[in-house]
Amino acid sequence: YRRQRQMCIRDSIYTPEMLKARHNKILTGLPDTYGRGRIVGDYRRVALYGIDYLIERKKADFAATNRQGMRRGDFQLREEIADQVRALQDMKVMAQSYGYDISEPAKNAREAVQWLYFGYLAAIKTQNGAAMSVGRVSTFLDIYIERDIEKGILTEKEAQELIDHLVMKFRMVKFARIPSYNQLFSGDPVWATLEVGGIG
């Protein structure tokens, strides 16, 4: 159970002075689902392991919390792990709605790009963060791309198209956000840093 900002207002946790300041627009707040700060998730894991393996590992983490003499922190940890399992299951359903099965690891560059994107899309749809970056994924994707080019199932031009389309998809996430986020900013900004290229 988590207390959201609107609950604080409704339950009168705010003092009368705070409520008056809110009413007069002196004190404002962001929507409860607004992700604050810069988040750089490891979206590669979806492509690398597949969702079923990630769910299996999280269920093992949950089972490892079964012990006698549980404390308050243990209950919170179990709740958080259960939320993570549910989120991974929801991501699998979301990908299926687009016609993809992400239960297994990506087998080629196209799948690696798509699986990685689904990880990012699931995160930004739930966090609504203005600054949720992708990070440096080019070295990771390059492994799949190089392998597919060597096999003759992908050309340099097609590889470039994959990356171009990925960048376009990152720019279009604004359409997946909830209305309360869009009320904050004009122009639906997206600060999604994607590092491509470089050495090391």
Residue ranges and their predicted role:
Residues 11-200:
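Mature, well-folded catalytic/scaffold domains that follow N-terminal targeting or propeptide regions
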Residues 1-9:
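Single conserved hydrophobic/aromatic residue that forms the stacking wall/gate
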